Design a protein with these regions (language model features):
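Peptidoglycan cell-wall recognition and remodeling modules
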Residues: 1-88
Length: 88
């Protein structure tokens, strides 16, 4: 997760991506893991704060998304320091 967070937000919990396809579609990536609101709403942990910019809530939503989509973080290129960055 540390590699993914560094690549996605450079450890900035207030990071907002205002230029990619998600932003152009009205749902910018936000927070440490650069989660979009649609994913956050669907994947947030019920015990975590309901705030996409909250570091704990953002990371929990990202982990739930990774588990759903990839099964394991080992299959996420963006989280592998030996591979070039790639969105997840």
């Amino acid at each position: 997760m540390m590699v993914l967070i560094e690549r996605e937000s450079n450890f900035n919990p207030n990071a907002v991506n205002g230029w990619d396809s998600n932003a152009k579609g009205g749902d910018p990536s936000r927070g440490l893991c650069q989660v979009i609101m649609a994913t956050f709403v669907w994947c947030k942990h019920p015990g975590a704060p309901n705030d996409i910019m909250n570091p704990l809530a953002n990371i929990c939503a990202a982990i739930n998304w990774i588990k759903f989509k990839y099964g394991d973080i080992r299959f996420v290129q963006q989280a592998n320091k030996n591979l070039p960055p790639k969105g997840y």
